[in-house]
């Protein structure tokens, strides 16, 4: 791989709007130019990309065709309020209940089956990565961002149920992503808008927020998403966790022993974009120790900044190589590099899947 191609692997891009501002259902020249220019390691789909079954399958195939190294195709398919692919007249998908309801069942076998429903239906569209499950502990009733996206307010319950859902997603051949490290469950602010902080010490985090992530790592988690939350008692300032070397490298990589792929939360969110340029945010996150950059506000500017930082030595090339090795190893593990075919259409909204979700009260 050339240096330019290696840097491209660090990027996870999204294309939500057409040039006229309407939802992007049809692959267009603007998307093609960015994909061929950056050669990203992944592309994230949104509801704006979802119209019909055949439309979405074609859209994904065209994305794959523009990337010389097969990309991760990701989506937020958590269940409940966050499902980018929902049942419509044109898409007979299975609507999955909120994870809070799944946690309330107390049934870990059912939770794993729910993960299987989520993962297997994504394969129909060529999606190989699910930004789920939420591993946050819902410990602050004023937290409107997480709410019933979480499994429970009990850290051990979140640990058990999130690892079960991850296992189901994984068995379907899809990569689960544990989010939002080091825990977004005790915030009142919304990082989509601006800074949101968790005012806890590292010891307090270890007792609550980190419990599910520790369990996920022990169970073989391959990818972790780092949030943009601020941890003033840990960092001493408002630095987002996604740009904190102490959090990403010191805590997640070294103390907790995670050796998989670390990805940021979306870099176009207000907690980042209101305070950093796209290039600065990208470089700072890589310097903190992340492997992949999700949705920078300006993909080309972020790519150019990271490439320049590697060339200048501001980002060591050895670090770049280590990140690319992790990314490619994960793609290899899931058969992505050999080019996977689309999953069987019969999986979508199957009676077996409906029976599973019907068991969640």
Where do the PLM segments sit?
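A general structural motif
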Residues: 22-27, 203-217, 241-248, 252, ...
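Preference for extracellular/luminal or secreted protein segments
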Residues: 1-37, 254-255, 273-361
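Short helix-capping segments at alpha-helix termini
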Residues: 65-70, 169-173, 254-259, 313-316
């Amino acid at each position: 791989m050339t240096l330019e191609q290696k840097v491209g692997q660090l990027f996870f891009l999204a294309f939500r709007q057409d040039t006229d501002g309407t939802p992007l259902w049809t692959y267009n020249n603007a998307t093609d130019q960015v994909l061929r220019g950056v050669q990203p390691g992944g592309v994230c789909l949104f509801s704006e990309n979802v119209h019909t079954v055949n439309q979405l399958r074609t859209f994904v195939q065209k994305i794959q065709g523009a990337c010389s190294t097969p990309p991760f195709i990701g989506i937020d398919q958590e269940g409940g309020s966050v499902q980018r692919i929902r049942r419509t007249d044109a898409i007979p998908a299975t609507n999955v209940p909120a994870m809070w309801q799944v946690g309330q069942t107390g049934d870990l076998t059912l939770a794993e089956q729910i993960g299987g429903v989520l993962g297997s239906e994504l394969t129909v569209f060529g999606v190989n990565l699910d930004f789920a499950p939420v591993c946050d502990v819902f410990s602050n009733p004023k937290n409107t961002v997480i709410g019933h996206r979480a499994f429970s307010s009990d850290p051990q319950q979140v640990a058990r149920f999130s690892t079960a859902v991850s296992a189901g997603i994984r068995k379907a051949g899809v990569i689960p992503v544990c989010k939002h490290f080091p825990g977004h469950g005790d915030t009142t602010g919304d990082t989509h808008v601006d800074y949101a902080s968790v005012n806890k010490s590292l010891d307090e985090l270890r007792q609550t927020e980190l419990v599910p992530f520790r369990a996920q790592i022990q169970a073989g988690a391959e990818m972790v998403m780092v949030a943009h939350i601020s941890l003033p008692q840990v960092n001493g300032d408002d630095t987002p966790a996604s740009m904190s070397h102490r959090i990403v490298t010191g805590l997640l990589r070294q103390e907790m022993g995670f050796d998989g792929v670390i990805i940021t939360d979306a870099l176009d969110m207000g907690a980042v974009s209101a305070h950093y340029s796209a290039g600065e945010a990208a470089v700072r996150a890589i310097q903190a120790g992340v492997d992949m950059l999700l949705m920078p506000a300006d993909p080309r500017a972020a790519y150019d900044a990271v490439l320049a930082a590697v060339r200048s030595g501001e980002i060591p090339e050895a670090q770049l190589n280590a990140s690319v090795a992790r990314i490619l190893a994960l793609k290899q593990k899931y058969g992505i590099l050999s080019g996977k075919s689309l999953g069987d259409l019969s999986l979508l909204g199957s009676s077996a899947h409906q029976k599973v979700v019907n068991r969640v009260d």
